[in-house]
Amino acid sequence: IWLTYELTGDKKWLPLAVKYTEALDSVKHLKWHHDVGFMIGCSYLNGYRMADKKEYKDVIIEAAKSLSTRFRPNAGVIQSWDADKGWQGTRGWKCPVIIDNMMNLELLFEATALSGDSTFYNIAVKHADTTMAHHFRPDNSCYHVVDYDPETGEVRKRQTAQGYADESSWARGQAWALYG
């Protein structure tokens, strides 16, 4: 809705954007998956940027803190999913990282700018560097999932969870990689 508001300039979208953004307030506390980054980024971050909603600043920073709890320093990545629950638990993963996670970096960079805390920046850069080193094939297509050993940083597996095959190029994932 925020992007529709931005593209059209039509103020009729503003109350809807605010309403649906503020319904996501509790998301700032999610620590069990990486989606908090783009859920808050696409809503609160856009509202902060487009409508000068200064009150969104604290939500953005809190969400970045929640996302940062998923950072695995020895592997240099933000873990996407918990590997011990649900369907993810059946894959044998230890520290799965999906290319979608690149969408979260904007939130971390903005949280650094808003808070002055370079921890968020450092996590974003380290995650991006590690992703560049291990998610991409020689033809520059990317894997959907790279599983790491969270203690050593060693790559355990390169797979897909939603694409056609482990070695296929997944269009949506390619877009997320470019965005990040």
Model regions: which residues?
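Glycan-recognition and catalytic cores of secretory/periplasmic carbohydrate-active enzymes
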Residues: 1-180
